Amino acid sequence: MKIAALITGKRVETISSSATLHDLVNALNVHHIGALVVSPDGKKIEGIVSERDVVRAMPGKLDEITDMRVRDLMTQDVITCTPTSTVAELMTVMTERRIRHIPVVDESGNLISIVSIGDVVKAHISDLDSERKALSDYLKS
């Protein structure tokens, strides 16, 4: 299955690198998501920041975190995929790199969506179920 099938109609939330930690936590909570793409315009990707990044910033820095900016927490070397990437490819990358979110970009590198590990697992289960059904139908004939 191609990633294009997973992103149809899916909105991607972004945040500015100058946003505060408070803004970040609020956006994650309001949108019920685990990561935001860091972008100045909703197209160019500067980084990605997740709830895990927030948790990792806390130990020993509780007095400092209120002044932190998204740029202080985000991952700048962002792994991306395209709509033509496959679910199997993303499963491999996400497992090997231990990441939960991958932005989807067009041929110009502009952000068009984001895929989570949950999206990938659901698609993989759907693929397996379709394969199981096809094999079952074949054996019945």
Predicted regions located by residue number:
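Tandem CBS (Bateman) regulatory domains
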Residues: 1-10, 50-95, 117-141
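The conserved cystathionine-beta-synthase
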Residues: 15-32, 38-40, 80-98, 105
